[in-house]
Amino acid sequence: MTVARWLRLWERGQAMLHVTWGSKVRLWSLVPALLGTPRALSSLENRMGVYRKMWNPKEPCDWAQQYRERFIPFSKEQLLRLLIQEFHSSPAERAALEAFSAHVDFCTLFHYHQLLARLQALYDPINPDRETLDQPSLTDPERLSSEKDVLQALRPLLAQANFSPLSEDALAYALVVHHPQDEVQVTINLDQYIYIQFWALGQRVGQMPHKSSVGSKRGFFRKLPPVERRYFKRVVLAARTKGGHLVLKSFKDTPLEGLEQLLPELKVRTPVLQRALLNLMLVVSGVMIFVNVGMVILSDLKMATSLLLLLFAAFMGVKASKVFGQRRSAQALELAHVLYYRSTSNNSELLSALALRAQEEHIKEALLAHSFLARRPGGSQGKPEETSRWLQSEVESWLLAQSGCDVTFNGPRALAHLQALTPSLGLFPLPELPQLDPMVLGTPEATQAALGSSYPSP
């Protein structure tokens, strides 16, 4: 091969490398434009730096203002029994409320079934668990664009299900602060993530369920008594790693400080105190072995001191590596065991679960609005703003008295749900039923055409 030919091949290789690298740079530069930066990770790192400088923070800054509980802490059946006991004690009133509840069930069924079908159609091209025949693979920009559409369609459904988004400050607190009774701790590399978003409902402060706690029942030398912790009954995660895909997962009974344990890319690490205790135990045992065995070897085998120290250091290094490896394996197994019980649904199944939860919250809001407005002089007559404010105040006070939970009730939305119900029983819901997201549900003309058809086949 001549020098000139070699130079031409080298220049061609440099040009191909430039094109390949340029395409990768252009692809990742599209990520903020396609996803709208759901989580600015650089800003998240800055917030994490603030919490690292704090001494033993107990909760995120201004947590009471950051997180407002909106979940109604009763099932539909429990709420129906409470409303009957409180406001509909006569047989006629009870029958009327039960008929109204069945009417709301019927009116919302088609609405959320259609919403779920549209949402699953959006998610199907990027579903990693698809069991049907393989479809043509998407390019990275197409996949990112599809993920953006799914997340945009998912947010109003989560809002109707009364999930509250966790702020960037709360996530920074969760990534930095570790509870002292969490024996298993993990670490993540933010550079591996494109976006991270959490939603939560059902905040509780108390002892966590046994199978959902990670190492909180034992210390290093003795058992530790259970302590009260801040945790959530349900948590939804949406995360995307570089080179990966959109991860949608739901978990139960998750502590605020344990959110990072739910992320897809993590490494188990040994806490500093446990690492120090293990090192101390290794040093003490090593000194005892050296005193009891090393001196005998020096005197009997006439081995050089430097060689003996070298062999002893190698032996202790192997032993330390084995001890720490076994410790990390045990912690990883315990974390996997706990996540097995915490996990409730993921990916496509999560969409179905969210649609059912949103429908139930929709029904509960309509039942509360119906029962409380029936007690109000004039009912729903008057200005909508005044009516919704009165409804919100009355329902929040009643929920606090019944459950002890400070719940923020969405009065305007509940009033809109009540007013959108069909005027007579036995009919499909009218097109005026509030749409959670026009992009998901389609145009009003398409909805009208669907509603004008006969009963759907079972």
Curated annotation (Swiss-Prot):
GO CC list: membrane; mitochondrion
Transmembrane intervals: 277-297, 298-318
Bilayer topology term: Multi-pass membrane protein
Residue numbers of Phosphoserine PTMs: 329
Keywords assigned: Membrane, Phosphoprotein, Transmembrane, Transmembrane helix
Organism of derivation: Mus musculus
Alphabetical GO biological process terms: hematopoietic progenitor cell differentiation
InterPro entries: DUF3754
Compartments it resides in: Membrane
Protein's name in the database: Transmembrane protein 143
